[in-house]
């Protein structure tokens, strides 16, 4: 059936045209509103992304404490099985008065920690080695280190023997977190404290160690014990850290211990009285762009410094300060690369209110300048 709508009048036509124009205007307005809303939404998303990026950058660059429920110090960090493992000493409240003989640093065991990423959850794997399990050791399990070779993990640690002389021991495990089984005797020819084992790209491993004052390094010369050992006079060359190639089984030295010489920019040995640059303790070695970086603590001036060289034995030339003084007496550190980023692990005593024997491990991103020098970090951050 056909319906005849009839002829539209001019008024009807005008009304339709007017309504059509209104629809066009409304449509344009909707498009404009949508466009503005879209721009506003995109701007909001952009600003949120910038804010999140800024927060992440702040988190990334701000030093972080590793754990809060246990006091740990002297962290040696390594990458094993695509995780970071940290091997620290374990501080305790020993009830011993703080004195110059450092008996109040009476650590008795080692806990090992791991994480999938910096800033992520940290796993405490519990006690990996206790002084009671080490036949030759008497007390004071100080700063350790670890290494992997031959399908085994090796934990290196200093401890005082039954006669109160510091020796360096080694314990072995099938897993990076332990537990570790100690050798029945310390490493032959070892002495002093703070072992750090570095494996070069050619597969050779070296141990760096030594520490003056309570670390007893001043009681040795050319690897031999001496009577009445003392610090050199201030205008004489300072005591040097020690280095030795490790045996293939990683359980002994493969050679006699050698001095590792640290020179000033003038090419002369750093003097014993140069407390801002001379070696005190806390050896660490890492490699960056083909250069060897030996870093250490200056002890009583509370700085972490570094020197560079062209081979594992040196000599090394002093370059600068990595970390300014922290809250607490001094710091001890390690440097490791993980997934393209370099990190500095160290400790301070801020959480314990400045008690030097109750320390907490921190981690911060480490950066290099174009010339290979290290950008200095503030210890109080």
Give short role names for the model-derived ranges.
Residues 1, 5-11, 18-59:
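Bacterial Sec-dependent N-terminal signal peptides
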Residues 9-17, 325, 375:
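Polar low-complexity intrinsically disordered regions enriched in Ser/Thr and small residues
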Residues 57-381:
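Carbohydrate-active catalytic/glycan-binding domains of CAZyme proteins
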